[in-house]
Amino acid sequence: MRKSVCPKQKFFFSAFPFFFFFCVFPLISRTGQEKLLFDQKYKIIKGEKKEKKKNQRANRREHQQKREIMRFKKSFTCIDMHTEGEAARIVTSGLPHIPGSNMAEKKAYLQENMDYLRRGIMLEPRGHDDMFGAFLFDPIEEGADLGMVFMDTGGYLNMCGHNSIAAVTAAVETGIVSVPAKATNVPVVLDTPAGLVRGTAHLQSGTESEVSNASIINVPSFLYQQDVVVVLPKPYGEVRVDIAFGGNFFAIVPAEQLGIDISVQNLSRLQEAGELLRTEINRSVKVQHPQLPHINTVDCVEIYGPPTNPEANYKNVVIFGNRQADRSPCGTGTSAKMATLYAKGQLRIGETFVYESILGSLFQGRVLGEERIPGVKVPVTKDAEEGMLVVTAEITGKAFIMGFNTMLFDPTDPFKNGFTLKQ
């Protein structure tokens, strides 16, 4: 016989689905949502704690590094580069305030008051006997992006082509100057002791800041004096040189007059002859830039001869500093050589001139134009009223960043200010 269901049971079974759907299910659903939210919040909190610990460890490391550096009296950051083989160490920070109303005055102040910095950065143990570099400054001249004072193991230079090419490259590749969107050529203007140098970084196709090569438009260059006779000790004897300006004054001499072929094997002889020639020409010949009073010495000797590379017009080695030999074709030397050839009618405006270094690396150069400066004359000027002939020279080469360096000067280090074994 079938059992009858009491009204209460009947109501319970009929009402249960509604009760579950409207009362129990929301509770279960809410519990699941709360659990999900809790898990998400837990993960966020856990991630924040992990990030906080990571930051704390990084801060402790940074603080420890600062404590370690604090015991050093001086520290400098540098970009180490080379241009066609020649070193270019660019000091980007660490200098105290250097007074001066222009780069020439800053150069003079460094030379007279803080030359130990140059020695410490250029010479051993941080550098070497053929090191080259520059101090980077905020520009003073209007329109410039960077200020530069150039240095080597022997002192300071008013201008340097290979280091200017390096600076233009570094300025773009490290973000010192901004690169416009879709740019292919980026202008970088340098404020130097010799004047404004206008550079251009040529970007690799499809890249935003990778420089394929760089060009500089140098300060006005000119032939200063022609066929100057200089008598050197044996075995060299009497030689004839041209004196030209390309940012620095150069004594330009054919290698055949010295009886030395331009090769790495003959480097020590080339250095000896170059140093002898520079010393004698500064002793016996007075030079003076007609517009820049602080430029009044021959700083470099440019020895040139037949090229090895069929693409080149000539091959050279430039001796400067403390008997240093330029590994690149020398940018200011290329400018001086082109100014000399142009004055002699042996190079035309716009004609490509290729100079080869002792390593075999190349600079491409062009004379972009000429100008006469009325009332200004140098020894080769025939007509004072017509004025001195100057040319605008462009040099193109390739520079590479090799590393970023922090140099520390330990006050207890007996060699902190550098040394050289070269006598």
Swiss-Prot record:
Family, per entry: Belongs to the proline racemase family.
EC number: 5.1.1.4
Naturally occurring in which organism (per UniProt): Trypanosoma cruzi (strain CL Brener)
Glycosylation sites: N213, N266, N282
Function comment: Catalyzes the interconversion of L- and D-proline. Secreted isoform 1 contributes to parasite immune evasion by acting as a B-cell mitogen. Probably involved in parasite differentiation and infectivity.
Quaternary structure, from the entry: Homodimer.
Principal EC category: isomerase
Active site: C160 (proton acceptor), C330 (proton donor)
Residue positions binding substrate: G161, H162, D326, G331, T332
Stated regulation of activity: Inhibited by maleic acid, iodoacetamide, iodoacetate and, most particularly, pyrrole-2-carboxylic acid.
Pfam family, one: Pro_racemase
Protein's UniProt name: Proline racemase A
GO CC annotation: cytoplasm; extracellular region; membrane
Reactions catalysed: L-proline = D-proline
N-terminal signal peptide: 1-31
InterPro entries, per the entry: Pro_racemase_fam
Activity versus pH, per record: Optimum pH is 5.5-7.0.
Annotated GO MF terms: 4-hydroxyproline epimerase activity; proline racemase activity
Keywords on record: Cytoplasm, Developmental protein, Glycoprotein, Isomerase, Membrane, Secreted, Signal
PANTHER family recorded: BIFUNCTIONAL TRANS-3-HYDROXY-L-PROLINE DEHYDRATASE_2-EPIMERASE, TRANS-3-HYDROXY-L-PROLINE DEHYDRATASE
